[in-house]
A protein has these predicted regions:
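Catalytic helix-loop patch of NAD(P)-dependent Rossmann-fold dehydrogenases
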Residues: 1-36, 43, 47-49
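C-terminal substrate-binding subdomain of Rossmann-fold SDR/epimerase-dehydratase oxidoreductases
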Residues: 60-214
Length: 214
């Protein structure tokens, strides 16, 4: 629930909580009509490849293994960009100043399922497991990010796009004409240099591990 006490479990989560408190501080000090939103992971065309979906697509396109932190069983919820754009539009028109609103995805998948889906949609041959490299898990990597979306649902919004449909969807707002996978395949040089973004641990050495002993 939106009103639940914030209890960050790691430094990254603490920065998210701190950002909210800074905004609330300005809100109370200057009576700014602030609305705070919290959402699940957003994905779609044009997303920078440091995020898991474009990262995996770009790695496969380059003939490199998809690097999975830990066992790959961590759960993540994904929101297609069109859905969250519609949520923002509704919030701007219907929410009240000082509201705090969760934007909840309608699906939850493991990171391993993300890799499987991308491999299948890219129509690659062979066993996907042969093209996955398990690396040491991130420090303080939460197993799951779950939020309650009841408040926004009562306002008339819910995510319409399943993860599978979002990966097949025809680009940003249906205008580009390419599904998520096809967009990255068609724009390999959209960014000058993404090699550092494709590293499993940009600041740590890649250490291959056996997922069965994690």
């Amino acid at each position: 629930m939106e009103e639940a006490l914030l209890d960050p479990t790691n430094p990254y989560a603490a920065t998210k909580a701190a950002a909210e408190f800074i905004v609330k501080g300005y809100q109370h000090s200057y009576n700014l009509p602030v609305i705070i939103t919290r959402s699940n992971n957003v994905y779609g065309p044009h997303q920078y490849p440091e995020k898991v979906i474009p990262k995996f697509i770009n790695l496969v396109e380059r003939g490199r293994p998809m690097t999975i932190h830990g066992s790959g069983q961590n759960l993540r919820s994904f929101l297609y960009v069109k859905d969250i754009a519609e949520a923002f539009d509704l919030i701007l028109h219907k929410a009240k100043p000082f509201d705090l609103i969760n934007i909840k995805a309608n699906c939850e998948v493991t990171v391993h399922q993300v890799a499987e889906t991308i491999w299948r949609l890219m129509k690659k041959e062979g066993n996907v497991e042969d093209h996955i490299q398990y690396v040491r898990d991130r420090e303080f990597n939460d197993f799951r990010y779950a939020i309650d979306g009841t408040k926004l649902e009562k306002m008339g919004w819910e995510a319409k796009t399943s993860f599978e449909d979002g990966m097949k969807a025809t680009g940003l707002l249906g205008i580009i004409g390419l599904c998520v996978v096809e967009w990255y395949q068609s724009h390999p040089h959209h960014w000058d240099n993404i090699e550092s973004a494709l590293d499993a641990h940009p600041t740590l050495p890649n250490v291959q591990v056996n997922p069965m002993v994690l």
